[in-house]
Amino acid sequence: MSDLNQSKKMNVSEFADAQRSHYTVYPSLPQSNKNDKHIPFVKLLSGKESEVNVEKRWELYHQLHSHFHDQVDHIIDNIEADLKAEISDLLYSETTQKRRCFNTIFLLGSDSTTKIELKDESSRYNVLIELTPKESPNVRMMLRRSMYKLYSAADAEEHPTIKYEDINDEDGDFTEQNNDVSYDLSLVENFKRLFGKDLAMVFNFKDVDSINFNTLDNFIILLKSAFKYDHVKISLIFNINTNLSNIEKNLRQSTIRLLKRNYHKLDVSSNKGFKYGNQIFQSFLDTVDGKLNLSDRFVEFILSKMANNTNHNLQLLTKMLDYSLMSYFFQNAFSVFIDPVNVDFLNDDYLKILSRCPTFMFFVEGLIKQHAPADEILSLLTNKNRGLEEFFVEFLVRENPINGHAKFVARFLEEELNITNFNLIELYHNLLIGKLDSYLDRWSACKEYKDRLHFEPIDTIFQELFTLDNRSGLLTQSIFPSYKSNIEDNLLSWEQVLPSLDKENYDTLSGDLDKIMAPVLGQLFKLYREANMTINIYDFYIAFRETLPKEEILNFIRKDPSNTKLLELAETPDAFDKVALILFMQAIFAFENMGLIKFQSTKSYDLVEKCVWRGI
């Protein structure tokens, strides 16, 4: 009997597992040999590239990538250091010390992670009071938290052994536990008498856009009353993620005038001017100098994408430069020769491509027009006596005049003319297309140095082999893919996505079916394109069923004699209808997950609505 009761006991874990709506399967991955080198590059030159050259390409890419990112990391670290220094200068400027008003700092584009560092002064106690939207439901709670943080920070300096914990809004016993802390401005009024120092309070309001503006307004007015105490100085820092006009619109005008008596604005979104963007682009030019060129099409692509993005320009710029470097090394067999030492690997497979380069052919055409010796021309075309090979090596060790002149102009503008509000990327683009003079006309100080700054763009031989470009749109599709168009194109032209059917030992029956019928999603999508905006689900199914190859499908489900369930299904008169319905339901639910259709918000499921369609 006890065994029977034991068997009837519910297994709680099994019961809980049975209530799950879905299951996650983690397939086991094959263990890789640690000694094996996994290089994510493929052999180029129609598969004729040696493994040594593939490895060399990977090593060169890794070197340039590491060098570039080391410089970017250094620039990003400097941004935070520069920002801290700017905020500190504003908090402790001499004009701020003398005026009896708020010292207001608006941090524009802030994600509220900016760290505020205060100085240690012998005659004044500096305290940082940070308030989040959660800590600011009303004026009483804001004041309560502020005074507690002020008292605990000041008392901790007087008595370092005492530890203070952050207060909890839901702690009802907090007031009883801390009766010595008064939740009005009496602590501020008596601060010098209690601690023997002047007081400088810095309020850091985080995520201001989410704080109740009426509460914030009243709290600022309350703090204003502290100006009657000579020993008190108050600074207000507002972390604004949207824009200043949003704050001005929601606070009272009298409060705005009070804040703007002494205020400063800082753009902390890392997009301030062109300073840091110029530094990152300059570091990239330094990384590829003497190795790679940048095409005007590629630089124009960078400018256009950055113009459409105002919040994360530095991250976007780094991403585009990084990806362009990777794609170049991945698809260009000649990238191995950016290190002239590797010229020993130059063979006929490379030389055939060299002789067909447009810039090289143009150069040879010029030699013919100049009536150069026939032997010299033939040695270049046929590599007779290693003529083409030596000519290519000579090209590799030449300096890039474009990058050098771009650095010269940028340095001249900053050091000689004190001009810093220029976009180095735009300057470089104008340099490439021969419009540098017109770009520099926007600064009158450049007019008398036009001859010195002028540059005539030149084409270098074999430049197409060593140039970062966006000719095929690879960067555009990889970094900014058109998801909708890609999905639709892949559903329509599935042959370009799935593996080729022309394989040895391919199952004849499966192959015949695949050649006649597209994948289920592609098969249904053809009908989807032709359907109206609102689709009757039954009519949709009937149309789908009629497009399926009936005989091939029935032959396919009969092909495995060991699968008795499929054989039984094949013998039923409505076998094809059942299979068609299963395929249709799979495709319909896949379309819903992909966002192509949605069921109408009614109890009837007879109709579905198209979410994406072409031509409208």
Curated annotation (Swiss-Prot):
Can the keyword rRNA-binding be found in this entry's annotation? no
User: Where does the protein end up?
Assistant: Nucleus
Q: Which InterPro entries match?
A: EF_Hand_1_Ca_BS (IPR018247), ORC3 (IPR020795), ORC3_N (IPR045667), ORC_WH_C (IPR040855)
Give the protein's function: Component of the origin recognition complex (ORC) that binds origins of replication. It has a role in both chromosomal replication and mating type transcriptional silencing. Binds to the ARS consensus sequence (ACS) of origins of replication.
Task: Please give the family membership noted in the entry.
Answer: Belongs to the ORC3 family.
Which organism is this entry from?
Saccharomyces cerevisiae (strain ATCC 204508 / S288c)
Keywords from the UniProt entry: Acetylation, DNA replication, DNA-binding, Nucleus
Which named protein is this?
Origin recognition complex subunit 3
Q: Note whether Nucleus occurs among the keywords.
A: yes
Q: At what positions is N-acetylserine found?
A: 2
Which GO terms of the molecular function aspect are on file? Answer: chromatin binding; DNA replication origin binding
The UniProt entry's GO CC annotations, sorted and at most eight, read: DNA replication preinitiation complex; nuclear origin of replication recognition complex; nuclear pre-replicative complex; nucleoplasm; nucleus
Name a biological process GO annotation: DNA replication initiation
By its UniProt entry, which Pfam families does this protein fall under?
ORC3_N, ORC_WH_C
How the protein assembles, per its UniProt entry? Component of the origin recognition complex (ORC) composed of at least ORC1, ORC2, ORC3, ORC4, ORC5 and ORC6. Interacts with ORC6.
Q: Please indicate which superkingdom the organism of origin belongs to.
A: Eukaryota
